[in-house]
């Protein structure tokens, strides 16, 4: 609907430094929709200067964006685990109420009242970028995430090294 997601706490800021990457979701957010439903955002980013397109962090590695997001798509208990873990780290606000409602809706299997967006970010050296191929399975096998939605973004800055790009990315999200 064009509205931005609310991300009450960026997981990345509590567990990572730009020079020491962690594993798993980097951000968890939500958006209230005009029809009264809530959309959950499960977001993860990976960095690659690998010359192949797509780089293995997209869909080949064991912990690739594709494989880790498929785990959340295929296993609601993992989504619930992340949501409840996340709720322990934020103070009681409107955000807590919205995310708590998501927990209840998922547990009650009221799928018409919530949606999931799988957010994927690829931080890429501009010399390696191929905007047609870097999406990998997220383009060729997008139907595997239905009824969810995939948002895939590539972050690349001309004239910036991968280290400079990563530093810019982390300064923005932390």
Model regions: which residues?
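Acidic, metal/cofactor-coordinating or nucleic-acid-engaging core segments within structured domains
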Residues: 51-130
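Short, catalytically relevant binding-site loops at active-site mouths
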Residues: 14, 47-50
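Short secondary-structure capping micro-motifs at structural edges
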Residues: 13-16, 28-31, 103-107
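Charge-rich, low-complexity intrinsically disordered segments
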Residues: 137-174
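Conserved catalytic cores of phosphodiester-cleaving nucleases, focusing on short active-site segments
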Residues: 27-29, 40-47
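A short acidic/basic microdomain associated with nuclease active sites
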Residues: 2-20
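Short, solvent-exposed loop/turn segments at the edges of secondary structure
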Residues: 22-24
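Short, solvent-exposed loop/turn segments that connect beta-strands within catalytic domains
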Residues: 33-38
């Amino acid at each position: 609907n064009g509205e931005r997601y609310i991300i009450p706490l960026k997981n990345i800021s509590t567990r990572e430094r730009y020079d020491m990457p962690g594993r798993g979701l980097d951000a968890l957010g939500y958006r209230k929709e005009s029809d009264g439903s809530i959309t959950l955002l499960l977001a993860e980013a990976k960095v690659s200067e690998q010359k192949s397109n797509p780089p293995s962090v997209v869909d080949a590695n064991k912990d690739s964006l594709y494989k880790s997001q498929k785990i959340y798509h295929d296993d609601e208990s993992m989504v619930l685990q992340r949501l409840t873990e996340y709720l322990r780290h934020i103070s009681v606000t409107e955000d807590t109420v919205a995310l708590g409602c998501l927990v209840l809706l998922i547990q009650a299997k009221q799928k018409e009242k919530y949606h999931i967006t799988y957010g994927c970010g690829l931080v890429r050296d501009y010399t390696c970028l191929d905007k047609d191929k870097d999406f990998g399975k997220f383009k060729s096998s997008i139907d595997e995430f239905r009824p969810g939605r995939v948002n895939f973004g590539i972050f690349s800055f001309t004239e910036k090294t991968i280290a400079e790009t990563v530093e810019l990315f982390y300064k923005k999200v932390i």
